[in-house]
């Protein structure tokens, strides 16, 4: 049935990626197209450039070849060497923190761009800022954290004059509250690893993006996030991250 559906799409002149729900943001040089694939895996397109973020979940056979790949963390719902290979154009750079580079040694081909928390680079023509992502209090046991400071990166990328922030796995840390001029923020909200919807909403109120998109929320109620931001002036867009 899936093969038949893809065939119909092709006969209609559509890419199989059209099977994913899409969302657009007006930007200089054309709209930015956001395609949620699954959980924290997302495809971003602008002006002919394709960016794949955390290609580790969902049916990646429908994703477009990426000119740039971003990886936030070592956990399996963010990192998959096989997933990177599926969505990456030949020679496309992969941006990752040092901890991820250690994990993928010998499994992901160059070029690899390692970024540390707080660092800024332009890679494949895209300005990128690495934002700390970590837990403040939550962990598997007393005195332990699920995500330690410095291990993973959130990312702010700039496309067509718009700043998109992918938070990755994090609680509401001071570095997030200090973000400025964010147009679109992808915010996680699942327990026990990140934060509940109410806490994510309070975090968003601190740095005031124009649009907030919940992701990485399996099992959580996005309605709570929407309700908490009602009247804040922040637009909430709930996309289909868990297709059936």
Placement of each model-derived feature along the sequence:
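N-terminal secretory signal peptides that target proteins for export/translocation
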Residues: 1-2
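Bacterial N-terminal signal peptides
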Residues: 6-19
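Core dinuclear metal-dependent hydrolase active-site scaffold
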Residues: 22-64, 114-180, 239-244
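Active-site metal-binding motif and surrounding structural segment of the metallo-beta-lactamase
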Residues: 52, 56-103, 180-186
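Active-site environment of divalent metal-dependent phosphoester hydrolases
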Residues: 59-61, 76-79, 101-104, 119-122, ...
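Redox-cofactor binding/interface segments in oxidoreductases and associated redox assembly factors
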Residues: 70-71, 129, 187, 214
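Binuclear metal-ion centers of metallo-dependent hydrolases, dominated by the metallo-beta-lactamase
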Residues: 108-124, 201, 205-244
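Proline-aspartate-enriched helix->loop->beta-strand connector
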Residues: 182-187, 191-214
């Amino acid at each position: 049935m899936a093969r038949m559906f893809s065939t119909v799409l092709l006969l209609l002149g559509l890419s199989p990626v059209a099977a994913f729900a899409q969302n657009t943001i007006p930007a200089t040089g054309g709209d930015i197209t956001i395609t949620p694939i699954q959980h924290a895996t997302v495809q971003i397109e602008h002006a002919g450039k394709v960016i794949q973020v955390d290609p580790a979940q969902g049916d990646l056979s429908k994703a477009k070849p990426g000119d740039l790949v971003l990886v936030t963390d070592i956990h399996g719902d963010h990192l998959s060497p096989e997933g990177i290979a599926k969505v990456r154009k030949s020679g496309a750079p992969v941006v990752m923190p040092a901890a991820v580079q250690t994990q993928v040694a010998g499994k992901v081909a160059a070029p690899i761009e390692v970024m540390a928390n707080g660092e800024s680079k332009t890679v494949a023509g895209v300005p990128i800022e690495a934002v700390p992502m970590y837990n403040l209090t939550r962990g598997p046991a007393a005195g332990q954290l699920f995500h330690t400071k410095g291990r993973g990166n959130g990312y702010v990328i700039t496309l067509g004059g718009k700043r998109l922030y992918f938070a990755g796995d994090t609680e509401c840390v001071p570095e997030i509250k200090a973000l400025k001029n964010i147009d679109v923020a992808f915010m996680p909200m699942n327990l026990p690893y990140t934060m509940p919807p109410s806490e994510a909403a309070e975090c968003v109120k601190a740095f005031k993006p124009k649009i907030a998109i919940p992701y990485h929320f399996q099992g959580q109620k996005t309605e709570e996030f929407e309700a908490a931001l009602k009247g804040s002036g922040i637009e909430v867009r709930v996309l289909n991250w868990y297709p059936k």
